[in-house]
Amino acid sequence: MQLLKQMLPSAGLAAAVAAALLFVVARWWKSANRCAGAIAVGVGYVVGQVLAAGWSPFPPRHATHWLFWFAIIGVLAAAADILVRPKETIRLVTWAIICTIACRLILQPKFSYSWSAAEGWLWVFATGLGVVVLTRCLELVERRPFGTATLFSVTIVVCSGACIALILSGSLLLGQLACILTAIAATCFLLTIVVPAPFPPRAAAAPLSLVCAGLWLSGFFYAELPATSALLLALAPAIALLPVGEQSYSQSRVLVYRTAFVTVPVAVAVVVALRASPPLDY
């Protein structure tokens, strides 16, 4: 109960901000409708993290501070992509550079105290590529029929699993930040289903992928999140791309099938984190 009291205020505020922004975009800021999802996710997360952990300085002093700025970068990248509309190759290369820089920044302590330059840059390029693939998976999910709802249902499952796994791995703060993303995704999902607005919360893949990747990297390198759990959480969204239930005439049934399949690797990730968690000696 005490844990819920600590986590609910920031998650609730983030969800409320996301809902308000979606309403504002749909009613009065229609020029931003194509990146409404990015705005809702990014700004909602920033507000939630400020309430949970305070304002993040620049330059950040801790890895978790970077998550605040990753959300902002994700919003700016999504907005620039909508406004400029670059060619696909330029868009992909630009995003790969952004992801590589983001991974380099959040892994700076490992460069300072643990890794050689070669080992460090190998990790940076590998994780940067992983973030690019994650973003692409989320974008492809969103482009499918009923894709916006599917994107947020998948995000709910993945982020709620990450919340539990991170708490089990010894980081209540990271778990709380994952809970904020879960609340935002749940709000966007409900609004998409219950109130089918003319401007759905689209283009959320960039801030979602950057912040999620930052959470998993922080959990793995700076907490006790098992590598298997981090990898399963990162790969889970790709399961939603499988041709599951496509022969069904009910889009809601397809949504349920895909979400259920994504739940499997997420559940395994939580179980692995539970088995690896240190015993509680009280």
Language model features with spans:
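Short, aromatic-rich membrane-interface segments at the entry and exit
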Residues: 32-37, 60-68, 88-94, 147-150, ...
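Generic multipass alpha-helical transmembrane bundles of integral membrane proteins
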Residues: 95-221
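C-terminal transmembrane helix-loop-helix hairpin of multi-pass membrane proteins
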Residues: 1-15, 174-182, 188-282
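N-terminal topogenic module of multi-pass integral membrane proteins
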Residues: 1-143, 244-252, 257-282
